[in-house]
Each structure stands twice: as C-alpha cells, then as structure tokens.
Amino acid sequence: MMTRIKTVQFVRLILLTIITFVVIQDSIACSGYKITIGNRTFFGSNHDAWFTTPHIWFENAANSKYGAAFTGSRFDGENGYAPQSGMNEMGLAFERLVAYHPAQENFKNRKTISNPTKYLKDILHSCKTVDEVKEYINKYDHSYFIEDVFIYVDKSGKYLIVEPYTLTIGNEPTYVIANFCPSITPEQNANKLDRYRNGVAFIKNGIDTTLNYCTALLDTMHVCRKKIGDGTLISSIWDLNNGTVNLYFYHDFKTTVQFNLREELKKGDHIIAVETLFPHNPEFEKLRNFKTPKNSNLIGVFIVTSAIFFLLTSIFFLIQYFRRKENKKYSYIQLLLFPIGITLFYYMIVLSGSVKVFYFPAPYKDPTNVFISLASYIPFLLLLLIFPFAVINYKLLKNNSWGYLGLGLFTFSNLIYIILIGLFAYWKFYDIFN
C-alpha cells in the first residue's frame, strides 16, 4: 500500500514539474523611444512578440477621467487583451517591456495588484502627467512586475521609468529604452542589445519630429529574425500633442494607418484586429502557420506525453537490465536506454518551456543555461541512433528475448523517435549551416 502511495506521489510530482515548465512564457523583446523638440513630443514603440493576435482598442472614460487607446496581442480572458502600449486623451503614453531585475523585499503597507491588466488600463484612465503616474504607482506594490520595466511619457516631454523597486523621472529631450532596467544596467551592457544600440546611434546623427524621422527610428530598432522572418509584431508612433497614433504591422514600415484618439472615442468602445488594417503579409502568414508546442495543442500534448514516457521507460529498462541475470540479446541496449531516456525527458521539458528554441537559429544557444545550449544537439543524437535502433528492433521482433512489454516499449520508443526527428526537421533544428 505504501509503495502504491509513493508511486502516485512520484507521478504527481513529475506532472507538476512538467506543467510548471509548460506554462512558463518566454520573455518578449521590445524597444521604444521618446523625442521632444519645443512643444512637440513623440513616443515610439516596437512590440516584438510571437503572438498572432495584435489589436488596437479604444476605451472611453466611464467613471474615470480620460479615454485611452491601447495596443496589445496577449489575450487575458475576461479582461480582454493585456495592454503593451497606449495613450490617453491628455497625451500620456506608456510602454511595457520585459526586463530582468533580481528579487528584493516587496513593498510593505501598499495595495496589492490583483488584476494587472485592469491596473495598467486604470493608470491611463486616471492620470494626465508622469508626476500623477508616479503618485498613483507609489500606492501599490509595483514589485509585482518583477520581470518588466515601463516607460511613461507625457506631452511636456517628461518621462517616468518604472522598475520593480525604483521610480525615476527624467526630462531629457531624447530617451531610448529596450529590455533592461536602466538603474542596474551599465551602458556597455545596454549596448549589447542591437535594437538599443541602433536607436542611440540613430539619434546621435540628429533629431526631428517628422513622421518620416520617427518611422525611420522605429525601423532601425525593429527585429526580424532570419529563420522564419519573425520579430516585431506591432510598431506605433504616438503624437502626444495632437492625440494621434500611427500603426505599423509586422516590421513593414512602408504602410501605416493613422488613428485620431478623440475621433475614435466618439465611436464608443471598440477593438480592431491590426492585421485587418494592412495588406496581406506573407511573413506574418508564415508565423501564424508555424506550429510549436505553444500554439498547437496536439504537439504540446505529444511533447509532454513523450517526456513522461521517456522518464518512466528509462527507469523500466534500467530495472529490467539488472533484474534478469541471464544473458539476453542486446541487453546492453536496455542499459543504454536509461541515459537516453533521461536526456530526452530533459529535452522535452526544454521544448515545453522555451519558445525561443523554435524561432532562433540552430543550434540554439541559451545565454543563461549551458545545459539548454547543449540540449540543442540532442536532435543529432536521435539521427545517429534511429537506424541502428531500428535494425535491433527488427531482430528483437523475431526472437522476442526482451518479453512482450520490453519489446513493445522499445518499439514504441522508436516510433516516437521517428516522429520527433520529423518535428525537429520541421523546426529546422538540423539547419546549422544556414
């Protein structure tokens, strides 16, 4: 009885571990800038994401003070889409960017943020200057956003940088931001990000507030990866003094659509799919049709199920190897299947948890985890093993020296290997020379 209970607890622990990895969302790169000349302030935003549902929507003030426009692509259930950038009627704009900050002690005696989407919308609905935003945010434990940095800009040109534990107001005529917390990031480290470095260099050559200039600046900071052409999903230029926004779709800066905030708010609350505003974009279609465990339930279930299968069968074959003392044909394969199974179990977890693996060039290199980087060579291991394993599988089918269960599990393992090799080829994991 105790053995059964321990087994159930062990399986539950495995499932919990896998599910934890599956629900982790990868960081999303973004960049932005603000430019102020005289009484004109422009705010530019690049939203780099693998989502395929970019939207712009307009919300009137209701019981709050100011109507606002927002852009975003991540659906947040009953809250609608989570805002990534936006601007209100008073010329206050913002952008949210993913950034690392080491955890510290949370703020005491402050309000908790229980609904981040509503919280971010309420700031634009309630504030008209960055000073008011700072006062508003100081009421909350904004360390809730431990993986984010925000920039707020008002039409005077002042800006507020919101980090998990720091609020900083500035008033320089230009400012460029990307995926880092400025208070803890030396300039030489920030310059390692191409989009930030390119933006700073562009501004050093001179600034103005024409739409052509602001578009060119966004263009030089956009991302487009070679593998499938993914990168910047939505770009926006917010004119904080005139209350307009120019949208650009999927790093194509030749076509833009402009909205006037006050005119749109007169139409009532409404939401528009950004894709419908622009001509057909083949690169975006490529992104939409590219399947991974993150956007395909079938592939996701297969990867998670394979992880469980590899872990359990690796243990099974190890026990089988030591349990049967008589000399069996190819018994060394059973011993070999243990490290192979553990290795593949780990790789399935990597594939379940990191979307970057599928979009960055092969072999994928993780700057923070050497084991994930090494795991990128596992597809080649399967290529080397599949033919000899298939031959041994065929011979074992003739004499069945492993027993029906052992032979069945080995055969099923080989079938999974073949499917995985096909998926690895589809994801271009073998294209290491491109």
Explain the meaning of each model-derived region:
Residues 1-9:
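N-terminal secretory signal peptides that target proteins for export/translocation
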Residues 33-81, 85-87, 92-125, 148, ...:
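C-terminal, well-structured catalytic/ligand-binding subdomain of enzymes
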